[in-house]
Structure formats: structure tokens, C-alpha cells
């Protein structure tokens, strides 16, 4: 789909990133995160009636699909808008795009993860629309 995604490189592994990755993994595997996901899904269903992937618009399922963190600044205290529903395939594409671009990584390092997320989602939607037209 996107040429640049094939040659992706993971960001450098610094001690700070390693520690952050450990905290993230611990949170994502916790019962508290599973409760937060359920609360998020319940609230989103009340707000919009149904939940769809932010990229491809396929129905989102709590057990099968992912919530992308548009911000890590409130890890463990996420606001509703910090979480973006995505099917597993689209979530992987978003992370591949981040990994493939040092520009995206620099923006994230400066605290602009939400902007990067929104921009990548918009670009992926454009690419998917072009694929449908062909």
C-alpha cells in the first residue's frame, strides 16, 4: 500500500525509551487497562451509536481490535479523546508509518503525538480511497 512502510526502521532504543516501553507493556497487560477499554467502548457507544475503525471504518470490536493512544501523557489516566479505535491491521499501519519516518518520530518526541496520529490516519484514508477507485 504505502511504499515507505516497507523500509521501516524502529526508533533508537535509549534507556528512557526502554523504561517507557516497560511501563507501557505493564499497563497494557493490566486488569485496569481492560476495565478502561470496556469503559471507553461503553462511552463511545453511547456517544456515537456504533464504533468503527478510525482508518477503514470497519466495525470495531472490543475483544479483537485496538485502541491507539493519541497521547501517552496521561498513561493510566487516559481521557476518552486520547484513545482512537482501530482494527488491528490499520493500527499496525499507523505504527509502521511512525517507524518509517524520522520526521514523525521527531514530532512525537516534541509532544505532538496527537498531530502525528491524525495526519497518518488522514493519509491512510486517502490511500484507501484511491485503492477503492482503481
Sequence positions of predicted segments:
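A boundary/linker detector
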Residues: 1-61, 100-134
Amino acid at each position: 500500500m504505502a511504499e515507505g512502510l516497507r523500509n521501516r526502521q524502529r526508533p533508537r532504543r535509549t534507556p528512557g525509551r526502554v523504561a517507557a516501553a516497560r511501563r507501557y507493556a505493564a499497563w497494557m497487560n493490566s486488569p485496569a487497562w481492560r476495565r478502561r477499554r470496556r469503559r471507553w467502548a461503553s462511552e463511545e457507544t453511547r456517544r456515537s451509536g456504533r464504533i468503527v475503525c478510525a482508518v477503514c471504518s470497519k466495525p470495531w470490536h472490543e475483544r479483537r481490535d485496538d485502541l491507539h493512544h493519541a497521547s501517552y501523557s496521561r498513561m493510566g489516566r487516559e481521557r476518552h479523546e486520547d484513545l482512537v479505535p482501530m482494527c488491528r491491521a490499520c493500527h499496525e499501519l499507523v505504527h509502521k508509518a511512525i517507524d518509517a519516518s524520522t520526521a514523525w518520530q521527531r514530532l512525537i518526541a516534541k509532544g505532538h503525538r496527537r498531530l502525528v496520529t491524525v495526519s497518518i490516519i488522514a493519509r491512510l484514508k486517502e490511500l484507501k480511497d484511491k485503492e477503492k477507485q482503481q
